[in-house]
Regions:
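Flexible glycine-rich beta->alpha loop in the catalytic core of nucleotide-sugar glycosyltransferases
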Residues: 119-120, 176
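Conserved N-terminal beta1-alpha1 strand-loop-helix module at the mouth
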Residues: 1-75, 82, 87-113, 144-146, ...
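Charged helix-capping and loop-helix junction motifs
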Residues: 128-137
Length: 179
């Protein structure tokens, strides 16, 4: 049984935000079903606790780039992170960023979902060539029971619909939720 919704719209913070509350409000207004805190300068434990209390009932994940620890409803790991050795609670989500099918295959052994991409040019990866959308299609066929969330340049409804049509279980974006 998947811990994810049938279709996820994942809002990822930019590396820095002026107001995490305003960002969350905007992301939720644009339809985000999950928030991922990926901050260059992590919040203090006190700030994080107060923010989490204000946003009780909203699913949010802690990105490994924001620091160690297990906070929120889950943790998202980079492709180069070591897989976790324990899960704080059975309902706690683990996700992983993947940039190819080999990384994705490894993620299926321990993660609850994976981000796969990037599929379009992005400001966060300006020097890296995007993956062809056929990679997403192949990934969904190879791992039909594993939730794959497309990431990278999903800034418009037509791009999002392409990901859905190819079988992605959702999309993750920074820019889409800032518009």
């Amino acid at each position: 049984m998947s811990k994810l919704l049938p279709w996820e719209q994942v809002a990822v913070t930019p590396l820095s935000v002026d107001s995490l509350d305003r960002w969350a409000e905007k992301a939720l207004a644009r339809g985000a079903t999950m928030l991922v805190l990926r901050l260059e300068v992590p919040l203090s434990m006190d700030e994080l606790w107060r923010w989490a209390q204000r946003w009780e009932g909203v699913r949010w994940l802690w990105h490994s780039r924001s620091g160690p620890g297990f906070y929120g409803h889950g943790k998202h790991f980079t492709a180069s992170d070591t897989p976790p050795t324990h899960r704080p609670h059975p309902s706690y989500l683990f996700g992983r960023s993947c940039h190819n099918l080999l990384e994705l295959e490894e993620a299926t052994t321990w993660a609850d979902y994976a981000w796969l991409g990037h599929f379009y040019q992005t400001a966060s990866h300006p020097l890296q060539a995007p993956l062809p959308l056929s990679t997403l299609e192949e990934a969904v066929k190879r791992f039909p029971n594993f939730p794959i969330i497309a990431i990278g340049g999903f800034t418009s409804p037509d791009r999002i619909e392409k990901a859905r049509a190819l079988g992605a279980r959702g999309f993750a974006s920074i820019q889409y939720f800032l518009a």
